């Protein structure tokens, strides 16, 4: 008993740095946190891990639909050695997404809660206050509706590249993006959580061995979109110094909306709230339990597309809004004015963004459906509003993507390529051009590889599917069994590129294929079994859509490419 007491007293009165003989304890501005050391087979460098460190107050009660507030201080040593709950979401879908995307070998059972504003930290075990290592802040994807920090184990990236990895969480769905379009609930709560996490990093990361003057934000899909939003936001000035958007930028269809009122009214109606004023709606929704809001989310069936329902009257995402806080103007205006954080920026896509994962999770164009030209047009007309595409140009686009073939498989594959281009490829090229033209160092890539960890249901011809890059970025071939030497080598190369960029704003380094800067020649890097330079990513498709949409007047309340 006496020894236990003395041990706890010692933890409460001193900070332990990089001493594997005792668990790491670190001071934060709010109190001390206790972590743990984890080892990595084949690597002498172990990693100090802190899981579930609070960066804001629980967003409950009056803090629902409100900006995050600083965490309350604590006087004890907080145990941060277990995964925090993920933010409220459909548990079955969230668990499935985690199991598909995680880089770790073992499966973990997830918990979900409205109290979820926590972050996970992975730092080399020999860290000190003076280490000043590059910091890489990860923002997960999931359509602003699913996902969490703990899907991604940062130990491999941290150990192999001597960086501090911070994986953050942010409110999702109704909790993160409900907006009435006025002062009663402006929205963008999830983005404000991301900003709060970056402030926490500035105030605390030095004690974990990180350099607050060298912070890189990186994210994939909705996380890449979030990175793109944060690049444009005045709230993040000096909070980060480099950025990486993987498979998602600010023009990702469906994730940015101009008219929030219909969705707000639908949510209020489903909750049984009066809708006479915004104040009444917000007050009513704040009284609902977490479970009641979750049931509304499930009924809205967010992310799921269906050819059986009227997609014009459905809401597939609860979206980011131009709120005059996070985003002072429409992103197109901000980019045109070149008034944003012109930090070095990597933007990339995967070769077949709509190859298998997204069609499977979102429920459109199943692999076993045979399509003729007429059916393809009908199907895409149902989704035109989501993608911001005028319905009358869909037949022209179908002709382009079916390439003269009447074969049902080729038509289906053409539709998937169509959706991949309008969702990811074209927006990524356009944002890269805008960033380049503002004078910021810009790099582009296209990832082309079939990971050995893919679902057995996935067709073998889908190479470079949505989220495939995550396995390489987080070292899945090193953590999990069954990877080939080629796959391990690819992962080490990608981690080296990302970490070099985090160190100095340039991904290049000794022993790596040269990655050219994205300038007027529009050179980029193809990353895969063979990694090589190429030029003008998706040039033909960009030209096609640019010319096609230039002939059209903007459609109200939709995000056109």
UniProtKB/Swiss-Prot annotation:
It holds the Pfam family COesterase. Glycans are attached at residue 79. Its EC number is 3.1.1.1. GO terms for molecular function: all-trans-retinyl-palmitate hydrolase, all-trans-retinol forming activity; carboxylesterase activity; carboxylic ester hydrolase activity; retinyl-palmitate esterase activity. Keywords: Cytoplasm, Disulfide bond, Endoplasmic reticulum, Glycoprotein, Hydrolase, Lipid droplet, Microsome, Serine esterase, Signal. Expressed in liver and kidney. It is an enzyme of class 3 (hydrolase). The active site is at residues 221, 353, 466. PROSITE patterns: CARBOXYLESTERASE_B_1, CARBOXYLESTERASE_B_2, ER_TARGET. It comes from the Eukaryota. It is found in: Lipid droplet; Cytoplasm, Cytosol; Endoplasmic reticulum; Microsome. GO terms for cellular component: cytosol; endoplasmic reticulum; intracellular membrane-bounded organelle; lipid droplet. Gene3D superfamilies: alpha/beta hydrolase (3.40.50.1820). One of its GO terms (biological process) is lipid catabolic process. Involved in the detoxification of xenobiotics and in the activation of ester and amide prodrugs. Hydrolyzes retinyl esters. Hydrolyzes p-nitrophenyl butyrate (PNPB), triacylglycerol and monoacylglycerol. Shows higher activity against PNPB, a short-chain fatty acid ester, than against triolein, a long-chain fatty acid ester. Shows no detectable activity against diacylglycerol, cholesterol ester or phospholipids. May play a role in adipocyte lipolysis. PANTHER family: CARBOXYLESTERASE. This is Liver carboxylesterase 1F. It comes from Rattus norvegicus (Rat). The gene is Ces1f.
